[in-house]
Amino acid sequence: MSGHSKWATTKHKKAANDAKRGKEFAKLIKNIEVAARTGGGDPSANPTLDDMIKKAKKASVPNDNIERARKRGSGEEAGGADWQTIMYEGYGPNGVAVLIECLTDNRNRAASEVRTAMSKNGGNMAENGAVSYMFKRRGFVLVNKGELTEDDVLMAVLDAGAEEVSDAGDKFEILSAPGDVAAIRDALAEAEIEVEDSDSDFRADVLVPLEANDARKIFRLIDALEESDDVQNVYTNMDLSDEVLAELEA
């Protein structure tokens, strides 16, 4: 499968060191705080918060950290920041479109760190709308294949808003509108199919195929951007073939 799933897998393998792990913890904690502020601090009445807490637990974030973030967000405890979501747009090496999603309490710091990472790694900032039109936010749910067939998964989620089920290596990926992810998770639970992961992200309509050396430049840019604590996600329209992925993972 081209695009997201394959290079996300590669990226996750690259991220398995302590520094990356610490930053991932910080991002998960921030998401819990924002979810609690937006929809209330009761996970049973706030599906987004419930999902963020589950993701944090799965990533082994300590329960105390999770609970403090929930309380800060809900106002039960002082110290919550005024988080804002900001999108930045630009181009990486080889004209690859880059969409950068930040969650920050300091717009000036976020803009400065994103601009510096882009300029030092062959990227250029772009005006709002210059690349975002190429991307669409999609919901996704991942399930482990195990003994399942694509038809098994499709039959379970067809009436829940699923738009597509595709092969993603050792998993099946279900795509939908972002608002249908919860219904799809519920449908899978009813069919006794375990969910590995779910979220929403941005997918590009038009992809740029890259060779391994050019892909490495984009990964360096992504790594530099993700050094900023304000950067939550980086999306690109690069496309990596199985051969290129194998070379990157070698």
Curated annotation (Swiss-Prot):
One of its GO terms (biological process) is regulation of DNA-templated transcription. Keywords: Cytoplasm, DNA-binding, Transcription, Transcription regulation. It holds the Pfam family Transcrip_reg. GO terms for molecular function: DNA binding. It is found in: Cytoplasm. Residues 1-22 are annotated as: Disordered. HAMAP family: Transcrip_reg_TACO1 (MF_00693). PANTHER family: TRANSCRIPTIONAL REGULATORY PROTEIN YEBC-RELATED, TRANSLATIONAL ACTIVATOR OF CYTOCHROME C OXIDASE 1. Belongs to the TACO1 family. This is Probable transcriptional regulatory protein DIP1378. It comes from Corynebacterium diphtheriae (strain ATCC 700971 / NCTC 13129 / Biotype gravis).
